[in-house]
Amino acid sequence: MQYVSWDDQYADALCELWNQELGDRFPMRTELMRQNSFEDQNVVKAGSWIAVDAVTQRPVGFVVAKCWQERLDIQLGKGIGWIQVLLVSTAHRGQGVGRELLARAENALREQGVEKVLLGRDPYHYFPGIPDESAEVKAWFERQGYHSEDRLENDLLGQYPEPAELELPEVPDGRFRLLTREDEDAFLTFLHRCFPGRWEYEVIHYFQRGGTGREFVVVELHGEIVGFCRINDANSPFIAQNVYWAPLFADGLGGVGPLGVDAEYRGRGLGLAIVEAGIVALRNRGISNIVIDWTTLVDFYARLGYRSWKQYAKYGKTFS
């Protein structure tokens, strides 16, 4: 077995390997793999490797390690590293390939000062944990010193077989509306005040990638933004997490979330209402399948007809 440094010339072959192993559940697109695993500035090149069969010269496994490396005023995961993905072909398992890839990733993360490694949950992640049905994968990582953490995370699915033209909900003393490019500064100020961290980071990237605002429904009270809901579809400026697996749906996929309401205005039903507003906006674009990703609030969203579609077990490992 040969181990070669992370190199985007292998992107198509790695995408093919992924789909060979996971494509029925999590169909990969080369565009998505390049976006999340090659273009992300947080990829640790010294910890990301490709296992290549010495005879066929085809990739049979790979690992992607990340830690925070961006030069922004915010930081995600101080002291945290991530294994974005570790995949070995079924035919090459049980030969130590996975252990070698993981060791290389962990050693590089240690050298970056990482104190704890999480599986998934990285910037530009694929998964918030190990797909819960993958019992053998969970057992393998447990043997490597990883421990299950907290509750299962869920991707939820809502489906609307009948097309509809709907009106945005009404709110006393305010309104729901789509964001515009001119709202960028006010929206980022709101997020920095109310939701600093990952959601703020994702919106910074959204506008940097040419976002126009159409991916956000906001609620305004007395002219001030007090809540938001992100919505994604095939026309978004990059592939967002709740539409990663759109190829599973012949008639397309939309996504809702994240969402949040200023703490001062909670308890008024605005959270559920802004989700409804996001759903209305997507349905008016002709979208009949909608995913809400990475949540434990299954009962909350069940009120809108959403059910758990995929589940993920969160795992981490603290370096001693």
Report each predicted region and the residues it spans.
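A short beta-loop-alpha structural element at the N-terminal edge
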Residues: M1-E16, R175-F187
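A conserved beta-strand-loop-helix scaffold within acyl/acetyltransferase catalytic domains
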Residues: N19, G23-S48, G61-K78, F195-G260
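A structural microfeature
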Residues: G61, D150-L152, G227, K310
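Conserved hydrophobic beta-strand within the GNAT/NAT acetyltransferase core sheet
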Residues: I83, V117-G120, V256, I290-D293
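Conserved acetyl-CoA-binding loop-helix of GNAT-fold acetyltransferases
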Residues: V88, G94-E111, G257-V261, G267-V280, ...
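Acyl-donor-binding surface of acyltransferase catalytic domains
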Residues: A103-P172, Y315-K317
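Short hairpin/turn module used for nucleic-acid contact or packing/dimerization
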Residues: G267, A273-S320
